[in-house]
């Protein structure tokens, strides 16, 4: 299973490289995916993913909830040394990796065992949370500096959310997934080396903004502009619930009210970025 998913990652990196690009969903306005990796660099990144899976003894695993974080750790960790020219090129690759893994859960519910689901979450919610949280936690391993974290985490969350239709989710699964994806991103910020509490508020603002803006990218039968109010509530509740799980020097309950404001301001600021038939930002 791991080798198949890594093969799909390789294909995704190739199909979005060398001036070609794709989108996170079938909507013509949705987020564009591209990267500047050479074929040799793609091989290095893919080989690192394979090595990480092997090191975790997951070569024969049939559990995507176990496998996918290792693929992210390996592939993202390689980006620091593969020779990318700047942080924006690195972030582009991280977006392709996130999109590829979300697409790889489509049609594989049998590889998402309920025994691996987190308490209070479905297996699908768990794997999406793990994709997001592992990617955010490994942004520094990808060679990004602390000043890039807000932008990178926003982009990654925007990609994962926009890709949910490509991941085969049904309209009834979207709300829970949004909650867990946003929570996973926010509560992983404390895993990033060199990232300080002074930058936390802006990053949380960026994450809820990215998740909210991507609501217009999701292509799922039965999902429409009528669902947006509920979806934005899921984004903000996920981010807010994660605030209590952050452990950082200088961060305490004293920070909570200002962080909740950042959750709200991020979501509110992105309402105008949502493009959907029948949507008018004044409605929310």
Model-based region annotation:
Residues 1-284:
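Non-catalytic all-alpha helical scaffold/repeat segments
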């Amino acid at each position: 299973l791991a080798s198949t998913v890594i093969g799909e990652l390789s294909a995704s990196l190739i199909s979005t490289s060398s001036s070609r690009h794709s989108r996170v969903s079938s909507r013509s306005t949705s987020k564009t995916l591209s990267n500047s990796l050479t074929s040799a660099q793609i091989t290095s990144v893919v080989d690192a993913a394979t090595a990480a899976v092997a090191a975790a003894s997951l070569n024969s695993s049939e559990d995507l909830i176990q496998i996918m974080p290792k693929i992210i750790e390996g592939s993202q960790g390689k980006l620091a040394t593969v020779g990318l020219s700047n942080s924006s090129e690195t972030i582009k690759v991280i977006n392709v990796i996130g999109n590829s893994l979300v697409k790889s859960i489509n049609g594989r519910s049998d590889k998402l065992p309920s025994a691996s689901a987190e308490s209070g979450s479905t297996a699908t919610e768990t794997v999406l949370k793990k994709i997001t949280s592992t990617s955010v936690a490994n942004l520094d391993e990808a060679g990004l500096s602390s000043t890039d974290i807000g932008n990178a985490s926003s982009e990654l969350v925007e990609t994962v959310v926009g890709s949910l239709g490509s991941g085969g989710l049904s309209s009834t699964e979207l709300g829970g997934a949004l909650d867990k994806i946003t929570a996973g991103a926010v509560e992983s910020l404390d895993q990033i080396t060199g990232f300080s509490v002074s930058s936390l508020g802006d990053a949380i603002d960026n994450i809820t903004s990215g998740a909210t803006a991507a609501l217009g990218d999701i292509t799922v039968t039965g999902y429409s502009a009528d669902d947006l109010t509920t979806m934005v509530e899921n984004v903000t509740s996920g981010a807010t619930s994660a605030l209590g799980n952050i452990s950082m020097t200088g961060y305490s309950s004293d920070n909570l009210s200002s962080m909740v404001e950042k959750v709200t301001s991020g979501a509110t600021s992105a309402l105008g970025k949502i493009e959907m038939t029948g949507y008018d930002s004044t409605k929310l």
